[in-house]
Amino acid sequence: MLEKILRTIQEKICLQQYIMTLHAEEEMEDDDSSIYDIENGILTGEILERQKDQTSAESKYRIRGETVMGEGIEIIVKLGATAKVVIITVYALLGEEGGNEL
């Protein structure tokens, strides 16, 4: 099931059917990441876990992948009400190469 959700998220990223929260944009800037790093992280990544929002009961997904330079990055996303991917937050995995070694 998570593979199907990941493919859907990745397809929407390729079609640029996503939005970023202000928080995600701020975190991206703080980590000196670019939108290309975020997109690449999702496209090369895998879902580590599904989380449930306590208030809304919405599912969100923690994805670990690679930046364009091969560094580790994690992105929290959800599928929004408008059928776009909502990028909630992002964070660089400092000192970690590659995104899929667990």
Predicted regions and their residues:
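Ribonuclease/tRNase effector modules and their secretory precursors
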Residues: 1-102
